[in-house]
Amino acid sequence: MGSSFGDLFRISTFGESHGGGVGVIVEGCPPRLNLSVESIQAELDRRKPGQSHITTPRKEADQVQVLSGLLDGETTLGTPIAMVVRNKDQRPGDYKDMAVAFRPSHADATYQAKYGIQARSGGGRASARETIGRVAAGAIAKQLLKQAAGTEILAWVKRIHNIEASGIDPQRVQLSDVEANIVRCPESAVAERMVERIEAIGREGDSCGGVIECVVRHPAVGLGMPVFDKLEADLAKAVMSLPATKGFEIGSGFDGTLLKGSEHNDAFLPSDDGRLKTATNNSGGIQGGISNGEPIVIRVAFKPTATIRKEQQTIDSDGKATTLAGKGRHDPCVLPRAVPMVEAMVALVLADHLLRQQGQCSLW
């Protein structure tokens, strides 16, 4: 329960952080899609641990193995695509103290309360290693969207702690800009300050959070359903299912509450190709729950990493007061590695809605 996502383009992830491996089964991918396994691996490389000194030092190759669903390793058959990544660098001993004391703001206590048992080593399904399956599946969804609709999805770090990049143009930013530094912020000068802040907070044995911004360029028009399956609602659910997420906004977001209707409304403009075009994009590319063809722009808030080296007050499994200083290898800030996770979840939502749109509205 709770490990599957999507309707027509549907994924199911499996595995624990310190188990034999993690992976995903993708169902509903159309046949005859030219699929690059190298592109899947490239997305996983952006997510994997140990890629810089500001991420967890856990060393994992995160090499994907595609078990089914492809012809000659490059063409989808329309059958389930199964992918697995083996865990290689587990250290269960790092979690000895956490086996008897709950980590504040982590899933330890709530998993124990719900199930009466928990995978204490590595956090089990609450670990960010679960997102390997999402990123692998999202890489397939990205390729489907690009080939079928010309859609591009790109995310970047907008804020770390209280350091924010305010000059990024979602229409112009490129992947090379995002990947130019280890924090994945396109503004190089701001990125340097972000890295310094993560380093300083990490030296204190503490952690920090921030905001990731994501743009969808050239989205198909008409994606989304009225009422309960609005596109922004499904996007919110998707990204808010990622570990450590605490907030979501689209378009003008909460700042839009400071505007009057005459200031916030996106005026329609004539276009030569018959597509909808607006003078502004406060709606973030979605109106009435349905995409209008303008860029979809969202922002996602991530809390500080829960497991920190600083000693904290907590309780043990018997409910008695104790203290805990986290051990193990954890990111002082999840934002740099969360960028491909956000892109993946956005891609999964759009791929699912693209298939739903084709199935309902393209018969005649």
Curated annotation (Swiss-Prot):
NADP(+) binds at residue 47. The lineage of its organism: Bacteria, Bacillati, Cyanobacteriota, Cyanophyceae, Synechococcales. Reduced FMN (FMNH(2)). Homotetramer. This reaction introduces a second double bond into the aromatic ring system. FMN binds at residues 125-127, 288, 303-307, 329. Belongs to the chorismate synthase family. It catalyses: 5-O-(1-carboxyvinyl)-3-phosphoshikimate = chorismate + phosphate. Its cofactor is FMNH2. Pathway: Metabolic intermediate biosynthesis; chorismate biosynthesis; chorismate from D-erythrose 4-phosphate and phosphoenolpyruvate: step 7/7. The keyword Heme does not apply. Its EC number is 4.2.3.5. Pfam families: Chorismate_synt. GO terms for molecular function: chorismate synthase activity; FMN binding. HAMAP family: Chorismate_synth. This is Chorismate synthase.
